[in-house]
């Protein structure tokens, strides 16, 4: 499948060896395919829909029944006993029954719809796993930044206390540093909780516990703009989006249901036949007698519905209203796809600019912190200035980290909206991960 745009640009992208690191995106996705309840449920529904085709086709085939019986009759009015042995085979074959053909066609379309929904759920699983995975990495990065900020503010607090003891700083500087340090401690508690919850969200999908994941290789990470316009992408989505395809089939099924309901006005023709054998014996005090019979029959039966109390007309109207509803659902699905394609395409292009800006913001914030610390040492800047500069540096790092993950997810979301999201995309993203440092 042709890729929409590269996620990572590198001379050589090798997938992570499972012998070195098992808990990467590809491994977790494979676990999700085997254990995700949503996917397994939709798979079972798809199998049921295909089995319904066989059930609908059976109505067009001969219906053959074998019967047999042995009955003993006794009477109190006369000292006699009669035994009846019977057997028979009968068949019925529809020659014309419009509803049976429509039902078969509808069942086949529902099977295709279920297959499309299953494929859409597979794509949804890729996106759900990717979102949950990168939420863990996002929370992990945030915790690392908070802990780094805590260490930096802690050093500044100790330096401020020392300066206060020798008379170089006011007590208010100590209080300001202590206040920010306490705030960072609270942020650390929240960040740890967020990481725990993000791991739990990943466990919900696969049923497996995780403690450490492969991380994004930021040195090899590169973002690129989409090469096609939103209108060109929308055109592709019209043909390939799986949810849109399922909505179209749903409209077709609703149209067939009108035909199915109106077929109640049409006659039906069946070929019926059979063979029956019977042996009836009577036993009384005077004599023993019996009779045997063999019956053969075959014929064509016509059934014409003349009046059903208005039921057929009512069912037809219900089906017509349902068709209108399905048509509106299709229009809503189309508009949603158009919105998603444009939004995700815009998000990708916006992320490119944001990534560049955040990269520069990190450089600028680092330089600003160094300059502010130097100014504080010579008395031209206050501890509040240093603390603010420290916070800006770690905020810039967090924003840059978030922007990378947002870009990757936007690319995957766009591919899902177009209908091209596949397992190859999982492998492409997985190739941009690396073993985390201990």
Swiss-Prot record:
InterPro entries to which the protein is assigned, alphabetical: Bacterial_OMF (IPR051906), OMP_efflux (IPR003423), T1SS_OMP_TolC (IPR010130)
Role summary: Outer membrane channel, which is required for the function of several efflux systems. Required to export RtxA cytotoxin.
A Gene Ontology biological process term: response to antibiotic
Signal sequence coordinates: 1-22
Keyword match Signal: yes
Designated gene of the protein: tolC
Cell compartment(s), UniProt: Cell outer membrane
Protein name: Outer membrane protein TolC
Source organism (scientific name): Vibrio cholerae serotype O1 (strain ATCC 39315 / El Tor Inaba N16961)
Protein topology in the membrane: Multi-pass membrane protein
């Amino acid at each position: 499948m042709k890729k929409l745009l590269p996620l990572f640009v590198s001379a050589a992208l090798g997938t992570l060896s499972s012998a070195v690191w098992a808990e990467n995106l590809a491994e977790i996705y494979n676990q999700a395919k085997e254990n995700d309840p949503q996917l397994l449920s939709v798979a079972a529904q798809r199998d049921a829909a295909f089995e319904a085709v066989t059930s609908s086709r059976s109505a067009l085939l001969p219906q053959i029944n074998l019967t047999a019986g042995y009955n003993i009759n006794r009477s109190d009015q006369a000292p006699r006993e009669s035994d009846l042995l019977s057997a028979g085979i009968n068949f019925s074959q529809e020659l014309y029954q419009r509803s049976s053909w429509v039902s078969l066609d509808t069942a086949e379309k529902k099977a295709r719809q279920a297959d499309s929904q299953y494929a859409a759920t597979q794509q949804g699983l890729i996106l759900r796993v990717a979102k949950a995975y990168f939420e863990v990495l996002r929370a992990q990065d945030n915790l690392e930044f908070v802990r780094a900020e805590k260490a930096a503010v802690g050093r500044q607090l100790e330096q401020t206390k020392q300066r206060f003891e020798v008379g170089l700083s006011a007590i208010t500087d100590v209080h300001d540093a202590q206040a920010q340090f306490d705030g960072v401690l609270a942020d650390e508690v929240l960040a740890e909780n967020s990481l725990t919850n993000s791991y739990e969200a990943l466990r919900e999908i696969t049923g497996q516990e995780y403690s450490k994941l492969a991380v994004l290789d930021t040195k090899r990470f590169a973002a690129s703009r989409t090469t096609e316009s939103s209108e060109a992408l929308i055109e592709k989505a019209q043909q390939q989006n799986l949810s849109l395809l399922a909505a179209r089939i749903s409209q077709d099924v609703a149209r067939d249901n009108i035909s199915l309901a109106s077929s109640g006005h049409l006659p039906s023709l069946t070929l019926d036949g059979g063979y029956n054998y019977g042996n009836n014996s009577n036993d009384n005090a005077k004599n023993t007698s019996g009779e045997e019979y063999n019956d053969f029959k075959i014929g064509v039966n016509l059934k014409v519905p003349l009046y059903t109390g208005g039921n057929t007309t009512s069912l037809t109207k219900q089906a017509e209203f349902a068709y209108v509803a399905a048509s509106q659902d299709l229009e809503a699905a189309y508009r949603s796809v158009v919105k998603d394609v444009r939004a995700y395409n815009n998000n990708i292009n916006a992320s490119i600019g944001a990534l560049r800006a955040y990269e520069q913001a990190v450089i600028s914030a680092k330089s600003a912190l160094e300059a502010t610390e130097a100014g504080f040492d010579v008395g031209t800047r206050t501890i509040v200035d240093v603390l603010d500069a420290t916070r800006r540096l770690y905020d810039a790092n967090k924003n840059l980290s978030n922007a990378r993950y947002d870009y990757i997810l936007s690319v995957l979301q766009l591919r899902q909206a177009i209908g091209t999201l596949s397992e190859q995309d999982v492998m492409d993203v997985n190739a941009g991960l690396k073993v985390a440092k201990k």
